[in-house]
């Protein structure tokens, strides 16, 4: 899969398009014909959708678009409503449309096949590289690296708790609230766990799922279940404030996702990782404005500014956390640390030396692509969306 890092960096730094309008504070103004549509599963009450919406607004400002040159549709379910929203955006004059949720994909593909002159871009999707439509594209980022870094922060907190006598090494058990048992979620919680174990060798983790991307009551209930089961630190791949507020109430440290929760949870929030979608939006908008092709499958990285962490909350984090994160981030960037180094985990007590991943996602759930090379599982290499779905030792699925 071709990466577009060099193209992206050039476009982010130099926004000089032929037929540009007058300059604005945000940069050169895109061609006046450009209009952009965004489709979101929820609204800004969801941390995931808020992160997407914030990036959409930032990218449009960067491109010099006026407020009447972009439309954001919120609370669009993962069903025919997504196609309807896409069609409405086309009717409104949008020539590039983005959608943010996994279940939007088939309906974005439906729209792309009907409206061939409009570009459709889907975040977290898996099918662009097999559909091969010239106007349909997937994007994701190597967020497993951000999760790993957040896991390092979690592991340091566990070490502090052990050193202070709050828990024993054997009691260093984390809990994780997941939305669905999809590869995207498994990849995220496994990388988080491996980051924690890289600094706290005795850590274990329990995972439970809510079967919803956003349900505050269920997420709070899941977090409380984990806490009551002896988990002393909680993280999540779910989009409400349910788990963080449960942690703040119980006084349990929390590593959140998609943004800082320090304002609401000052005593327990440690750090958060997130995808910054701005670089991809800028890249795609610029491609449309200049008549360039958008790649089928785009993967953002730490280097492109697509994987970011919030500031560390010194009130809750262990001493030296920010410095350790910076050290490990440098190692990830220079390649001396690999998140899914197969020497760092086992499955059923055995080192994994070969694994066929379901990269093509043809609906048969059968792996067809060898994902391990030179002792490393190559996540987001053959496709931008995650495909790591191994159940490694040390992590217990409470819902299995």
Which residues does each PLM region occupy?
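Positively charged n-region of N-terminal signal peptides that target proteins for export
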Residues: 1-11
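Alpha-helical transmembrane segments and their juxtamembrane interfaces
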Residues: 12-13, 129
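C-terminal motif of bacterial Sec signal peptides marking the signal peptidase cleavage site
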Residues: 16-19
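A residue-level marker of the well-folded mature domains of exported/periplasmic proteins
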Residues: 23-400
